[in-house]
Curated annotation (Swiss-Prot):
It comes from Haemophilus influenzae (strain ATCC 51907 / DSM 11121 / KW20 / Rd). A lipid is attached at C24 (N-palmitoyl cysteine). It comes from the Bacteria. This is Putative binding protein HI_0213. GO terms for cellular component: ATP-binding cassette (ABC) transporter complex; outer membrane-bounded periplasmic space.
C-alpha cells in the first residue's frame, strides 16, 4: 500500500488480530482548528512516525557470528541482509540475491542484485560473501559449524584445519554471480541461507561501521544503539521508520515507552505469540519388544489430550503432530475413534499382564508438570502401570544413548524453515536418527525429495513422509514452543510468523489524529 495512512477504506484487509479497529466515518461540520494547534498536532504525529523503539534484555552485538539470542539477531537483521530473507508472513524471499537456480540441488548459482550496496555506496559483490564465510570458518564462533550443517563442500575438513579455507565450495564467478557447491543434494539451501551467521561482513578497514541492510548504525552507547535508514538500501522506498532505537532494559523495566520487546518479562497485555520451529515430544523406545508395535504406540497416543497437558501454561501451542503446524500445509491431523483397550488386548496386554511404562525426563519445573499430567492421563487405564523418573539432563542423555527407557522427554528445533529439518530424524542414514527407526519406503521417499528439482514432487514426498510419521506414531507429540512478543497496538506491519523474525523495515505506526 503506497499511502500507508489512507486507512479509511471499507476493505476486508486485516492487519493483525491485536489491533483495534478505528471508525473511519467523516465528522459532520468539523470545528475549525487554529494554525498553532494544527502545526503542533502534525509535528507530534510525524514525530511518532519517525522513530521505532525496541527494548532488549541482553547485551547487543554488531557481529553476526557472536549472536547468542533472538534479541541480538533482530538488531543484526536490521543492519545486515543476506542472500535470502523473510517477508512479514515468514515466507522465504529474495534479498541480496535476486534469483537462484540449480540442476541437481548440489551446485547452486545465485545472482546478486545490481543495486545491492553497502551503506557507504559501494556495490555488494559475490566476493563479499565468499570472504565473509571464509572468515567465519576460521573464527572461534560456534556458529561456524553452520557451514558444515548446510552441507557446504569441504566445510567439515576446513573447520578441522585439514584443508585450506580456499577449499570451501564458494566461488565468485564475477561480481554478481556466486556459485555454491555442496557435499550432498540439499533442495532447502535457499532457506538455510537466511540464517544470521551467513550475513555478509564488510572486509575493508574503515573508521565507521558499514552494513548493507535497511538500516545503518548512527551511534551507540553502552546500553543503546541508534539506527538510521541506509540511503543505499536497494528497497529504501519501502522503509517507513527513519530511526530505530534499540535500548537495553532491566527485567523490571516499564515497557510503555517501547514499541517492540521480545520475551517481555512482566507484561501480559499487547502480547503476540510467535510459534517457533521447535517441538516438544516424548520418544518411544522402538527397540522395546512391546513399543516397537505401532498399534501399541497408537493406543498410547490416543489416550493423551495435549490440550489438557498444557492448558494453563502460557506461550505453548498444543500439537498433535510431530512437525510444527506451519509445516503441515493442508495435512492437518484428522481425529479418528480409537479404542485403546482393544488395541492393547490385541497385543497381549491385560490387567494380569499390564504394560509397564517408565516416563523419563530431565527434572526442570515444566518437564515435571508435563510428566505428572502425562502419568495421570495414562494411568486412567488399568492395563498400564506408569512410573515417573526425573533425572538430570546428563543422566537423561545417558539413558537415551543406552536405550534405557520406554518413554523419554525430547525436543527438536530447526535452524531453517523446511520439513526436511524434522523428517531427517527418521531417515535411517541420518546422524540425527537417534531412535534407530528404519523404513525402506521412508528412506526412498526422503532421498527422492532431496534429489528432485521438481518442487511439486518434493512437496508430494514430504506429504507422504509426514503421513508415515503420523501413521506409525513414531513419537508422542506434546506442544510447539512460541516466543511472546510485546507489540503496542499502534504498530502495524507485524504478522505472526513461524520464523520469529520482525524486521523494523516492515513496520509502521498508525497514529489517530486528535
Amino acid at each position: 500500500m503506497n499511502n500507508l495512512f489512507a486507512l479509511c477504506q471499507r476493505s476486508a484487509v486485516i492487519f493483525s488480530i491485536i489491533f483495534t479497529v478505528v471508525a473511519c466515518d467523516k465528522l459532520d461540520s468539523p470545528k475549525p482548528i487554529s494554525p498553532q494547534i494544527e502545526t503542533q498536532k502534525n509535528t507530534q504525529l510525524e514525530s511518532n512516525r519517525v522513530e521505532l523503539k525496541r527494548g532488549v534484555y541482553s547485551d547487543l552485538t554488531l557481529q553476526p557470528w557472536q549472536a547468542q539470542s533472538e534479541e541480538q539477531t533482530q538488531l543484526l537483521r536490521d543492519l545486515f541482509e543476506g542472500l535470502t530473507a523473510y517477508d512479514v508472513q515468514g515466507n522465504l524471499v529474495p534479498a541480496v540475491a535476486e534469483n537462484w537456480q540449480t540442476e541437481d540441488n548440489k551446485t547452486w548459482i545465485f545472482t546478486l542484485r545490481e543495486n545491492a550496496k553497502w551503506s557507504n555506496g559501494e556495490p555488494i559483490t559475490a566476493s563479499d560473501f565468499v570472504q565473509s564465510w571464509q572468515t567465519l570458518s576460521q573464527s572461534e564462533s560456534p556458529l561456524k559449524n553452520y557451514l558444515a550443517f548446510m552441507n557446504l563442500k569441504n566445510a567439515k575438513a576446513v573447520l578441522e584445519k585439514a584443508l585450506p579455507v580456499e577449499s570451501l565450495g564458494l566461488f565468485a564467478e564475477n561480481d554478481r554471480t556466486l556459485r555454491i557447491e555442496l557435499d550432498k543434494a540439499s533442495p532447502y539451501l535457499p532457506s538455510m541461507l537466511a540464517h544470521v551467521s551467513l550475513l555478509p561482513h564488510y572486509a575493508k578497514s574503515t573508521e565507521i561501521f558499514i552494513s548493507n541492510g535497511a538500516y545503518q548504525l548512527q551511534r551507540q552507547a553502552e546500553n543503546q544503539h541508534i539506527l538510521t535508514t541506509n540511503p543505499y538500501y536497494w528497497a529504501k522506498e519501502k522503509v517507513i521508520f527513519q530511526q530505530v532505537k534499540y535500548q537495553k532494559i532491566s527485567v523490571d523495566a516499564d515497557l510503555s515507552d517501547f514499541d517492540v520487546v521480545m520475551n517481555p518479562k512482566k507484561v501480559n497485555q499487547n502480547i503476540q505469540d510467535y510459534p517457533q520451529l521447535c517441538t516438544y515430544f516424548y520418544e518411544f523406545n522402538l527397540s522395546d519388544p512391546v513399543l516397537q508395535k505401532s498399534a501399541v504406540r497408537k493406543a498410547i497416543v490416543s489416550m493423551i489430550s495435549t490440550n489438557n497437558l498444557v492448558a494453563d501454561i502460557a506461550h505453548l501451542y498444543p500439537n498433535n503432530t510431530f512437525l510444527p503446524k506451519s509445516m503441515l500445509g493442508e495435512q492437518e491431523s484428522v481425529w479418528e475413534p480409537v479404542v485403546a483397550e482393544q488395541l492393547f488386548s490385541q497385543n497381549q496386554i491385560s490387567e494380569t499382564r499390564p504394560l509397564k511404562l517408565r516416563i523419563r525426563y530431565d527434572d526442570l519445573s515444566l518437564n515435571q508438570t508435563i510428566a505428572m499430567r502425562l502419568n495421570h492421563q495414562l494411568s486412567q487405564s488399568d492395563l498400564l502401570r506408569v512410573e515417573n523418573q526425573g533425572m538430570s539432563w546428563q543422566e537423561l542423555q545417558t539413558a537415551r544413548t543406552k536405550g534405557d527407557f520406554q518413554l523419554i522427554r525430547s525436543g527438536w528445533c530447526a535452524d531453517f524453515n523446511d520439513p526436511a529439518a524434522f523428517l531427517n530424524l527418521f531417515y535411517s542414514k541420518s546422524p540425527d536418527n537417534k531412535n534407530g527407526y528404519k523404513n525402506a519406503e521412508f528412506d526412498r521417499l526422503f532421498e527422492s525429495a532431496m534429489t528432485t528439482i521438481s518442487e511439486k514432487v518434493r512437496l508430494e514426498n514430504y506429504a507422504k513422509l509426514k503421513g508415515i510419521v503420523q501413521q506409525e506414531h513414531l513419537v508422542l507429540p506434546i506442544f510447539q514452543y512460541s516466543t511472546p512478543v510485546y507489540l503496542v497496538p499502534s504498530i502495524m506491519g507485524a504478522q505472526v510468523n513461524s520464523v520469529g523474525v520482525i524486521y523494523s523495515k516492515d513496520l509502521w505506526r498508525k497514529v489517530q489524529s486528535q
